[in-house]
Amino acid sequence: MQRIVSICPSNTEILWALGLGENVVGVDDYSDWPQQVADLPRLGPDLEIDMDRVQALRPDWVLASLSVPGMEKNIEALEQTGIPFLVLYPGGLEDIPRDFLRVARFAGLEQRGRKLADRFKKRLETIRQKIPQDRPAPRVYWEWWPKPVFTPGKENWLTDVSRTVGAINIFGEEEGQTVQSDWRTVAERRPDYVFAVWTGVPMKKVRKDKMMNRPEWKDLPCIRENRVYILDEGWYCRPSQRILTGIEHLAHLLYPDRFAPSDPDNPL
């Protein structure tokens, strides 16, 4: 049986979706889904993986990622170990089913990857077909980090997620995966909704009251009308099958007359 190490949370989730969970022998500190990962050896934060611990697990291969700036040093360190590895670098939403197939091929399970990718695409299309076309497109601001402000740009899956639900990412025309900005610029772009998905931060630690009281935002209708939502970053910041749960939840927030609440236990 192949021994696999995953050093990124979204990769861990993809391995489980492909039925390779029993092959995983170690994960990064932030991998927390599904529940079975709780008992696996931890190898450090996803930006500071301990390669000595990786080598000690004697993996047949490592599933790495470049989904977050700074992960490049993990790749450089892996190259020094001589352990075979596969690197995922998801940009848009369409890269997620492609990554299913890439991982499956690397594991010698191409047919399984094709089936998973097809299911992902079909469910995504089902969501798209239910989005109302006769309403103004809501303008949304995604907050990945508050200070300094980081938000998804043009080449980011959350821009595609916004488009999927008939919305417009107010930074969606800015080049790059991630854009650095400030609260005043956000206010000038007049979002209809604010979605906070602070990377690596549990929902309970995100202070909505402080967001609502930012002086730069005091005149925004979305603040006055309480259209500020703290969302589960695991549904939006990880390019895996669970992003479908996030998309369905977003659609429910925007169109409650069309979409029921999403089912977190059935991502795909």
What are these regions (language model features)?
Residues 1-268:
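N-terminal ligand-binding lobe of clamshell/alpha-beta domains
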